């Protein structure tokens, strides 16, 4: 706890003091983020630092594997769906970023047997990555180099989650109206570089090379 206490003191002295005016404004007027960022819970993925956003810019939803379950019209407890619903319908974000990353533990676990009976939620959750795994195996073959297979699975997973996101009626509607834009990002934790999925080239290209595009990847162009 000592390191956290010292970190908070440093935060107050440096970051908070530097951004005090905008933070107080956000507290008084409320948030109006530009984008919903759906990322992995992995501790090596740090959204605000990765793209140097300001406080209030990103509404962040993180889970294991940056997975998006398909839309289910029920009133059960759905953390990811709730974040999407709130960001799109209440906060009116204009962009959704689904950010996967290299060396993803969730994608690696897709190729491992989960025998621990206590991991019932983990086993079920990982099924959301099965489509990406099968696509990678079809593309490279089951005997392919393991690291190459994992990297491709991570990238295919981003595309799978975009397709799942488009099953949400209110998301699909706004995308078709060009009022909401979806982006697939692939973060390299070893270099800090981000690659962006270009639906025209059907590949991930450096984010630094991408001008903001109005062409949104959907189920037909992926």
What do these predicted regions represent?
Residues 38-40, 62, 99-101, 183-188:
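Short beta-strand segments
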Residues 28-47:
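N-terminal low-complexity or amphipathic/hydrophobic leaders
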Residues 44-67:
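Catalytic core of membrane glycerolipid acyltransferases/transacylases, capturing the structured
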Residues 1-33, 66-94, 105-222:
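Divalent-metal-activated hydrolytic enzyme cores
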Residues 30, 43, 51-54, 77-80, ...:
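Generic structural signal for well-ordered secondary structure
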């Amino acid at each position: 706890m000592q390191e956290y206490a010292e970190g908070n003191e440093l935060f107050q002295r440096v970051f908070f003091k530097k951004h005090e005016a905008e933070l107080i404004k956000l507290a008084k007027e409320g948030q109006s983020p530009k984008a919903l960022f759906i990322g992995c819970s992995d501790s090596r993925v740090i959204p605000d630092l990765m793209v140097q956003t300001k406080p209030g810019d990103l509404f962040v939803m993180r889970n294991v594997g940056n997975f998006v379950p398909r839309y289910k019209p029920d009133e059960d407890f759905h953390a990811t769906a709730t974040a999407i619903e709130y960001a799109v319908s209440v906060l009116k974000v204009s962009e959704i970023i689904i950010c996967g990353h290299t060396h993803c533990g969730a994608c690696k676990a897709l190729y491992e047997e989960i025998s621990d009976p206590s991991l019932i939620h983990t086993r079920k959750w990982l099924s959301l990555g099965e489509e990406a795994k099968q696509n990678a195996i079809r593309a490279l073959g089951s005997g392919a180099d393991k690291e190459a297979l994992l990297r491709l699975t991570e990238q295919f997973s981003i595309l799978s989650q975009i397709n799942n996101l488009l099953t949400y009626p209110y998301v699909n509607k706004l995308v078709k109206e060009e009022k909401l834009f979806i982006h697939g990002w692939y973060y390299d934790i070893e270099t800090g570089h981000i690659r962006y999925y270009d639906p025209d080239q059907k590949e991930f290209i450096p984010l630094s090379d991408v001008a903001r595009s109005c062409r949104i990847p959907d189920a037909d162009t992926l």
